Structures are given as C-alpha cells and as structure tokens.
C-alpha cells in the first residue's frame, strides 16, 4: 500500500481569491499531474492530507476527482477535533463536505485545540503513516508549510525509504504553461 501526504501553502499565502482563482486551477493541475503519474506507475493507493484552506483542500478535491478513474482512497486528517470551528460558515461547510466525501477522516488529537504540541503530533502521525510527501512549497518563499518541510527534512536523515517531492514556484510556472498549452489544443 502506497500512501502520500500532501500539504503546502495556505490560500492566503498565495494570494488566491475565491474558488475560481486561476492560481488554484494551476496548482490543482500540478497536483493532478503528480498523482496521475504515481497512479499510472502503480505507486499510489491513498492520499492523506489535512484540511487547511489552500493546497490541502485542493489536493483532496483532486483526489476525489481522480477517484472516479482510479482505485484511489482519500483520508482527511485533522490535528484536533474542532479544527476549522472558527472559520466562516462557508469554509466550515467546505470542510464538512470534504469529510463526508473522504474514505476516512479523523483527528490525531481527540480534544479541542490545546496548543502547538497537537501540530507536532499531527506531523509525526502524517510522517509515520505515509511513504512519501508532496509539498507545494518553495523553501525560498517560506510559509506555514515551512514546519512540515523542516520536519520531513530532519526525518529524512534517519529514514531513507521516504521520499519528499516539492512543487516549487518554478514547477508551478511550468504547470501554468503546460495547462495553457493543453487548453489551446481543445
């Protein structure tokens, strides 16, 4: 069983506005290309992601789309049980819809938010329950995913059977060109 942890920038870190922002389309296209390649090679069974607004929710949406054509499962993991409870009603509804459509969802901490320890435990869980990670993240442009990136880099020193794939800004520029080229062909 091959499992991938997907994370990356939050929507506000990328300056995305609304669900129809062209940047979201390009990011989802890049994620879809990565996942499709793994699926075609028989190297992916589960997408395991968080529920942060941004790359995590977009990757869950891509996994749900790919599930129509591939034997792919989606798990949405939360760092604590009431994650997202302070979001707007619309964003809470998006989270609930993702949880409803996922093959599995749970929280690594069964209580309400108590502190940073829950995020570290969440990271540890994600790393221990996946075989590779895909981060839409560029170390030259730090964001909240810096903590995931640094933790994975640290653990890679001890575990050589884990793989980290980065989709950085250069990769996103290439994905935008590829996406635009594919749209012209239609």
From Swiss-Prot:
Parts of the chain that traverse the membrane: none
InterPro entries membership: YspA
Domain of life from the UniProt record: Bacteria
Annotated family: Belongs to the UPF0398 family.
Listed PANTHER family: UPF0398 PROTEIN SPR0331, UPF0398 PROTEIN YPSA
Full protein name: UPF0398 protein LBUL_0921
Protein source organism: Lactobacillus delbrueckii subsp. bulgaricus (strain ATCC BAA-365 / Lb-18)
Lineage: Bacteria, Bacillati, Bacillota, Bacilli, Lactobacillales
């Amino acid at each position: 069983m091959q499992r991938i942890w997907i994370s990356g920038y939050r929507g506000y870190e990328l300056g995305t506005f609304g669900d129809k922002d062209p940047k979201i389309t390009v990011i989802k296209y890049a994620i879809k290309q990565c996942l499709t390649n793994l699926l075609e090679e028989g190297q992916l069974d589960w997408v395991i992601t968080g529920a942060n607004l941004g790359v995590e929710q977009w990757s869950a949406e891509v996994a749900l789309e790919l599930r129509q054509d591939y034997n792919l499962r989606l798990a949405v993991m939360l760092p604590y049980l009431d994650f997202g409870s302070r979001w707007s009603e619309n964003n809470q509804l998006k989270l609930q819809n993702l949880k409803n459509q996922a093959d599995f969802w749970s929280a690594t901490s069964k209580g309400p938010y108590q502190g940073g320890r829950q995020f570290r435990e969440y990271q540890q869980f994600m790393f221990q329950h996946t075989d590779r990670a895909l981060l839409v993240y560029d170390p030259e442009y730090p964001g909240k995913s810096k903590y995931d990136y640094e933790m994975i880099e640290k653990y890679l020193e001890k575990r050589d059977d884990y793989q980290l794939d980065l989709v950085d800004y250069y990769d996103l520029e290439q994905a935008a060109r590829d996406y635009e080229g594919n749209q012209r062909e239609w």
